[in-house]
């Protein structure tokens, strides 16, 4: 028996959209994807484009997930991490960061420590 994990994206920019599109193209179910961002109008566009669940509440988004993809700009990462830290410390999802220039040890500290954490550097064609 294999079930798809629920993956939440904190951040809904170009890179998150590209990853979501690729996941859906490869057969991942939209019902297992959550996306959060501060701009509800942009989120509604993402919902219409991909059929995923959306929210402006980062904590709620993180709470839904088996895996959380941190897809925000490096300059807001500390704030986002401290906001969701109480939730992810409780639920213990796999944390994945696609932000450039931030060390895993820094992310680990901001998230409260001890979570499974992966840094990746995705690249999309120009």
Describe each region flagged by the PLM.
Residues 50, 58-70, 74-126:
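Rossmann-like NAD(P)(H) cofactor-binding subdomain of soluble oxidoreductases
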Residues 1-56, 60-63:
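NAD(P)+-binding Rossmann beta1-loop-alpha1 motif at the extreme N-terminus of oxidoreductases
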